UniProtKB/Swiss-Prot annotation:
InterPro entries: Znf_C2H2_sf, Znf_C2H2_type. The gene is tra-4. It is found in: Nucleus. GO terms for molecular function: DNA-binding transcription factor activity; histone deacetylase binding; RNA polymerase II cis-regulatory region sequence-specific DNA binding; zinc ion binding. Residues 1-38 are annotated as: Disordered. Probable transcription factor. Promotes normal hermaphrodite (XX) development, in concert with histone deacetylase hda-1 and nasp-1, perhaps as components of a complex. May cooperate with transcription factor tra-1 to repress male-specific genes in hermaphrodites. Synthetic multivulva (synMuv) class B protein, required to repress the induction of vulval development by let-60 Ras signaling. Residues 10-20 have a biased composition (Basic and acidic residues). It comes from the Eukaryota. GO terms for biological process: hermaphrodite somatic sex determination; negative regulation of vulval development; regulation of gene expression; regulation of transcription by RNA polymerase II. This is Zinc finger protein tra-4. GO terms for cellular component: nucleus. Belongs to the krueppel C2H2-type zinc-finger protein family. It comes from Caenorhabditis elegans.
């Protein structure tokens, strides 16, 4: 009986195989007959071999009958060596993906080996997972593995925060702010000048300074730009975003109405806490409101009287006047009525600053664009008590600004005539010019009454001296002024109707009375004292 370990090979008579001219494909290899059942384990291991076509290079034809079995047995050590090599390569099969050409070479080498042994075999095709097949066909798997091999581990950076919660920076790149030094200098200057100003309350960290400035700035909802002046923000909305400007106006009106209601509620709570509110005497003396009273047009809506056009359609009402913040000079802190006045001020007082530019980081004003790139952008001389926050650029300007606007309990400039206080010297001068412009006064020689002109004093003294210049022609009334005599004639005498003896102070009223009540008209169109005509109606003047 044959050895079971020995291969059973089916031989055919004079099998002659020519040299292949083309490399067989996988489809042709699949058509070869499979190995018969009962083959040994050696053949099972042989199925996993991969032999290059160069190792199976043969020429001519051969017959299986003439092949010596010893030659077949000589191939067994070679097969075992290749088996060991293949088993080692299988360890890395999960890490590398073979190309389609390598699969073809695998089938070609196995067929040539089987032909050399005089057998036919079927190339085993390993079934791969669908994901690996797609990755192999598209090349994504190999590419992703290359990427995974090149990714470096993430380096964690340690961030250190200071006591304020900000990130600690390199002091060479971020030098310390000089705000504390400037505040100490201002305090010493205040004591030297003898002015008791309150100590400046300003942060010393430049990051907190920038945060405070951003909080006090107004930001546009649409373009996210920031504005330090509210009037500039309103002009920006009016010119760039008209739809937002209308909404902004409505919000301002609602805010004003809300403040008014809050004030009324606060007054009501105060009345409840204090036990009632006692109105002043002048309000008590006034008559109570009549419930049947019909208000005049525009009386209850702020004086806005509706207007109608020729066709009876109501006209568009004008928006009520609202006080806006006047523009201010960034160099000398003066405010003006409008932008035109501010431009005139620039041309007159700051000729070199007509085309100035303002930095949006430190809010300094420079002459032109060239100096904007080279200016010292720092927040050192900042006044935090102003709204909006102002950067005065120099210590001298900051000191003068605090003396002028932030004097604490001593703030305000007092008028020497009426003891009123004003915020700036300019407002004090304006008050004196408007209220105390009359430097000369004229006093009556008979009493202590004072007049602003000599003519007024002479007219008043006629009452004491008895000099009479005007006498009434109807009664014995006398007056020293013409206006007083005219008032007497109109009030005491006036015009009397000849029919019903009704009295009227003005001639047009008398004329209208005669036409409406008596169905006639006056004989004369001029207010003559005595008129006699053939007409029925006679007009009398006086009693």
């Amino acid at each position: 009986m044959d050895d079971p370990n020995q291969c059973t090979i089916k031989q055919e008579d004079s099998i002659t195989r020519p040299r292949p001219t083309e490399a067989p494909t996988i489809q042709n290899l699949k058509q070869e007959p499979a190995i018969e059942e009962g083959s040994s384990s050696t053949m099972d291991n042989m199925l996993m071999l991969t032999i290059d076509t160069n190792q199976a290079n043969w020429q001519g034809t051969y017959d299986d009958d003439e092949m010596d079995l010893n030659n077949k047995t000589d191939l067994i050590p070679l097969l075992e060596t290749e088996k060991t090599t293949i088993n080692e390569d299988e360890l890395y099969d999960d890490e590398e993906d073979d190309d389609d050409d390598e699969e073809i070479k695998k089938g070609i080498g196995f067929e040539l080996l089987a032909q050399a042994l005089g057998m036919s075999a079927k190339v085993p095709v390993e079934k791969e997972e669908p994901e690996k097949e797609r990755a192999k066909l598209s090349g994504v798997g190999e590419f992703m593995k290359q990427i995974r091999g090149e990714i470096k581990p993430i380096q964690k950076e340690r961030i250190v925060l200071d006591e304020l919660g900000f990130r600690v920076r390199d002091p060479s790149k971020f030098p310390p702010c000089r705000i504390a030094e400037v505040q100490q200098t201002l305090t010493l200057a205040d004591h030297q000048d003898g002015i008791d100003l309150p100590p400046p309350n300003a942060p010393t960290d430049v990051r907190i300074v920038r945060k405070l400035i951003r909080q006090k700035m107004v930001r546009c909802k649409k373009c996210k730009n920031r504005f330090i002046e509210k009037n500039i923000y309103e002009r920006h909305l009016r010119d760039k975003h008209p739809d937002l400007y209308e909404e902004y106006i409505r919000e301002q009106e609602e805010e004003v109405e809300l403040q008014r209601l809050e004030e009324i509620e606060a007054n009501r709570i105060e009345e409840l806490q204090t036990g009632g509110f006692i109105p002043p005497e002048n309000e008590i003396s006034q008559p109570s409101e009549d419930p049947n009273y019909i208000p005049l047009p525009g009386e209850n809506n702020g004086g806005l009287v509706p207007r109608f056009d020729y066709y009876g359609r109501i006209k568009q009402l004008k928006r009520p006047y609202k006080k806006k913040v006047s523009p201010q000079c960034p160099f000398c802190d003066k405010r003006f009525r409008n932008e035109f006045s501010l431009k005139k001020h620039f041309a007159k007082k700051h000729e070199e600053m007509v085309e100035f530019q303002q930095c949006l980081k430190c809010f300094k004003c420079v002459e032109n664009d060239a100096e904007m790139a080279n200016h010292d952008c720092e927040l050192t001389y900042v006044c935090f008590e102003c709204t909006p926050i102002r950067n005065l650029c120099t210590d001298n300007r900051l000191l003068n600004h605090r003396k002028k606007f932030h004097r604490g309990a001593n703030s305000g400039f007092r008028c020497s005539f009426c003891n009123m206080k004003f915020l700036t010297p300019r407002k004090l001068r304006k008050h004196k010019k408007m209220s105390h412009v009359f430097t000369k006064t004229f006093q009556c020689h008979f009493c202590e009454e004072i007049f602003i002109s000599e003519v007024a004093v002479m007219t008043h003294e006629r009452m004491h001296t008895g000099i009479i210049k005007f006498e009434c022609k109807v009664c014995d009334f006398r007056a020293n002024r013409y206006t007083a005599m005219e008032e007497h004639k109109r009030d005491e005498h006036g015009y009397v109707c000849a029919i019903c003896h009704e009295r009227h102070a003005e001639y047009p009223e008398m004329k209208h009375h005669v036409y409406e009540e008596h169905g006639g008209y006056l004989a004369a169109d001029e207010p003559t004292a005595y008129v006699e005509t053939p007409r029925m109606w006679i007009l009398y003047k006086g009693e």
